[in-house]
Structure formats: structure tokens, C-alpha cells
Amino acid sequence: MARRRKGRPVNGVILIDKPTGITSNDTLQKVKRIYFAEKAGHTGALDPLATGMLPICLGEATKFSQFLLDSDKRYRVVAKLGERTNTSDSDGEVVQTREVKVDRGQLERCIAKFRGTTDQIPSMFSALKYQGRPLYEYAREGIEVPRESRKITVYSIELLRFEGHEVEMEVHCSKGTYIRTITDDLGEMLGCGAHVTYLRRTGVSNYPYENMVTIEDLEALLEQAHREERAPRELLDPLLMPMDSAVQDLPEVNMIPELADHVLHGQPVQVFGAPQDGIVRMTSGDERLFIGVGHIDDDGRVAPKRLVVFRDEEEK
């Protein structure tokens, strides 16, 4: 007898506006509970201090979350000059206080040095792992371990405001970029130290900012459904973005349903007009039903890489 699954097979991406003070995983678990979803996963953690866009993949969409992990991000950050902390943000302890002698011209010149591709050494207070343990666990024990620098790209970094000891910036960057580290490095470059006091992620990939919803929004809809004796999915599911929204930047290969059936059974197929190489987004029929992500094999065929498993709500 098949084991009954806990939750329902809901598929899609919900753009959560994460509040400050809770972890990304706590946010994920709340969304999973509200949607009563079988599976859920987020697409790149935000610090507890940070707020903003946290795409959460539900159901089959979790298979494609890596593409969002690898996508560009946008942030709004406020930094305080004159104080350096052990975490590079206001959640940490002040370890050094220095006088601030910085003018706007000097600040803008230093900020400009972060544009482009550079090497960044991740903060000890990060979720990256060393010998199987997150770096922040070592940091809390007062242990510093070696970290390899990583290539990051800052596509743009703009100074929005400079008042007193406060600096506000907007950053568009590649995956794996630590805004706290940029802020700490900026403070050292200026000779006065700095740390993050406010951080908001305003963009992931091409997802629209206005489509974000809060946990409170979802809880209110859940309560409304209970009051009106309606199925919660009637109010909650319309907020979901399609699961292939995570891979919208990939070239599409549309195929007739007969070929799609072969692909869904693990067989590569020849599709007229497909790219000659690379990763592709596969769709079926005139309705362009998303069936998964594939790649072009050595024979020029479209071969499955990650496939959607289709199940009805009643099949739980």
C-alpha cells in the first residue's frame, strides 16, 4: 500500500516579502503550512535582518529552484559609517569605532571601485559550509576558518543618499554576492568602518516587485476561506506564478504532444528549430504546457534533464 503523502500537490512560485527578524527557513515553513504543500523550497536565503523578495517554489517547481539561485539579485542597503561589527550588520557586536571623515566625492569614488567582476571573500557569518558545518557556527564559537574567494559581478551600484553617517545604496549583482561584505569592505576603504543597518532585496531574476505578498496577506486569505467555508486553494492558488517562471530566461523548445510524451518517458527527440546546444525550456502543444528543462545532446536532439511529474489534486 502506497504511503499517503502529507500535503497537496500544488505547483508554482510564490513571491514572499520576507519580514525582518525571522529566518528564510522559518518563512518557508509558514508558507508550506498555509498552502498545505507537499514540497517547498526557497531560492536563496536572506539574513534575518533583511527583508524583501524571497521566491518560494512549491511542488514540482522545486525542481527548477536552482535557476533562481543562479539568477541576478537587486538590493537596497543602508549602511552606518564609523562602526565595524563582527557580523558586518547591526545584529552583531561593535568591534571597532572610528571617526568619520568622508565627503561625497570620496564616497562615490570608493563605491565605483566595486563595479564589475571582482573576487569576494565570504563573511564568516554566512551559511556557506566548511567541513560540513555552516561558517556561522564556527564564527559563533570564535573560530575563523579559511574561505576561498569567489568571483562576483556587481552590474551596478549607485549612491542614493549620504546624510551624516548614513549611506544608502542600490546594488544589482550576480549570485553569491554578500552585500554585508561589500559594506564592510567599503568601510575599510574609507578608513572609518561600516556595517549594514537595513537590507531589502528588491529583485530576483525578472520577477515583478509588485507581485510580492506578505505572510500576513496569506494568513488573511486562509482565514477568509475558513469564514466563507471555501477551499483555501480557491483564494491562495491564484497568487502563484507558473513553475516555469523560474526558467523564463531559457530558450523555449515547443514540441507536438507526441514528442513530448517521448520526452516525459526519458527519451531524447529531434525537434525542428531547436537550438544547437545548451539548456532549454520544453513546452508541449499549442497551449505551450511546460514539461521540464532539457539539454541538446551530441546528436542535436532535445534530451530531458528535469521533468515535471503531473498529478491531479485527487491523487494524494
Swiss-Prot record:
InterPro entries per the UniProt record, alphabetical: PsdUridine_synth_cat_dom_sf (IPR020103), PsdUridine_synth_N (IPR002501), PUA-like_sf (IPR015947), PUA_sf (IPR036974), tRNA_psdUridine_synth_TruB (IPR014780), tRNA_sdUridine_synth_fam1_C (IPR015240), TruB_C (IPR032819)
Pfam families reported in the protein's UniProt record: TruB-C_2, TruB_C_2, TruB_N
Protein name as annotated: tRNA pseudouridine synthase B
Family: Belongs to the pseudouridine synthase TruB family. Type 1 subfamily.
BP-aspect Gene Ontology terms: mRNA pseudouridine synthesis; tRNA pseudouridine synthesis
UniProt catalytic activity: uridine(55) in tRNA = pseudouridine(55) in tRNA
Gene Ontology molecular functions: RNA binding; tRNA pseudouridine(55) synthase activity
Broad class of enzyme this protein falls into: isomerase
Active-site residue list: D47 (nucleophile)
E.C. no: 5.4.99.25
Function, as annotated: Responsible for synthesis of pseudouridine from uracil-55 in the psi GC loop of transfer RNAs.
NCBIfam families given in the database record: TruB
Keywords: Isomerase, tRNA processing
Keyword tRNA processing: yes
